UniProtKB/Swiss-Prot annotation:
The species this protein was found in: Staphylococcus haemolyticus (strain JCSC1435)
Compartments it resides in: Cell membrane
GO cellular component: plasma membrane
HAMAP family in alphabetical order: YidC_type2
Regions that span the bilayer: 56-76, 134-154, 170-190, 211-231
Range of residues in the leader sequence: 1-19
Protein name: Membrane protein insertase YidC
Its biological purpose: Required for the insertion and/or proper folding and/or complex formation of integral membrane proteins into the membrane. Involved in integration of membrane proteins that insert both dependently and independently of the Sec translocase complex, as well as at least some lipoproteins.
Residue numbers spanned by region Disordered: 266-291
Domain of life, source organism: Bacteria
GO biological process: protein insertion into membrane; protein transport
Keyword set, alphabetical order: Cell membrane, Chaperone, Lipoprotein, Membrane, Palmitate, Protein transport, Signal, Transmembrane, Transmembrane helix, Transport
Membrane association type: Multi-pass membrane protein
Annotated GO MF terms: membrane insertase activity
Length: 291
């Protein structure tokens, strides 16, 4: 669900970016400019000029790291919830599949409502909350205005500073650079691939689509934008690759450990149910023999 929601979101961002023009000073006003673009300009130029002695490349890298650290609690919570839901769904799958069959066979609205209600009861039984997965979009939504603010600061060189000291490593921060663009695209592909490794097979199709769509959109925007934006995306993607790899490795074990008592409980209940069934059969046979 989360990945499906990102596609129209990214397309909407493209339309938004194409429609805004801050090249003229008279256009530099309004809610979005005053809330995101102007503050981003001040932060970037304060870091670049005052803190890092006119090294705007380092300023952008530090800005990425600060944003990623702010988002880290949301991301870690999302990783944990995803792994917990995945492990719980493994336990609940037989019952979920049975209810889904009822939903498919339902012919009337009443039957569909009854089946959906039964599904909610199964989710409640296994402590599964599908709404938690929707929170996975929160870091993206938080970061989006920041990225768009940075985009306009770099595209229209709002605030000067970076235009006077544009050089970082091998490229010019205010002009497009093919190599940093390729690096950004490749890193976003790797990030999507690392994320997909922990997903069930049936959920990977949308992730595979994102592995193609995201890098293409990143490359497309970067080719017509200041390479500073490509630098931002490259550092952000590299951080995400490392974060995703270690978070998945850790929270997979945490989820398995937390769900283990639930699995044991249901195994014990099933075992007791089977014993009761066998005892009932034995009593029934003995009664028949007495007769």
């Amino acid at each position: 669900m989360k990945k499906k929601a990102l596609l129209p979101l990214l397309l909407g961002v493209m339309v938004f970016l194409a429609g805004c023009d801050y090249s003229k000073s008279s256009n530099r006003d309004g809610f979005f400019y005053n809330t995101f673009v102007e503050p981003m300009s001040k932060v970037l130029h304060w870091l670049g000029h005052s803190v890092f002695n006119d090294d705007y490349g380092i300023a952008i890298i530090v800005l990425v790291l600060v944003i990623r650290i702010i988002l880290l609690p949301f991301m870690l919570s999302n990783y944990k919830n995803s792994h917990l839901m995945r492990e719980k769904m493994k336990v609940a799958k037989p019952e979920v599949d049975g209810v889904q069959e009822k939903v498919k066979r339902a012919r009337t609205q009443e039957e569909k409502m009854a089946a959906n209600q039964e599904m909610m009861e199964v989710y409640k039984k296994y402590d599964i909350n599908p709404m938690k997965s929707a929170l996975g979009c929160l870091p993206v939504l938080i970061q989006m205005p920041v990225v768009m603010g940075l985009y306009f600061v770099l595209r229209y060189r709002i605030g000067g500073g970076i235009a006077e000291h544009p050089h970082f490593l091998w490229f010019n921060l205010i002009h497009p650079d093919i190599w940093i663009t390729i690096i950004a695209g490749v890193l976003y592909f790797i990030q999507a691939w690392v994320s997909s490794k922990q997903m069930p097979q049936e959920q990977r199709q949308m992730t595979y689509m994102m592995m193609i769509v995201s890098p293409i959109m990143i490359i497309w925007i970067s080719l017509s934008s200041a390479s500073a934006l490509g630098l931002y995306w490259s550092v952000s993607a590299a951080f995400l690759v490392v974060q995703t790899y270690f978070a998945n490795m850790y929270y997979e074990k945490v989820a398995q450990r937390e769900v283990a008592p639930m699995i044991e409980k249901f195994k014990e209940n099933n075992s007791n149910s089977n014993k009761k069934g066998k005892n009932t059969q034995v009593v029934s046979k003995n009664n028949k023999k007495k007769k």
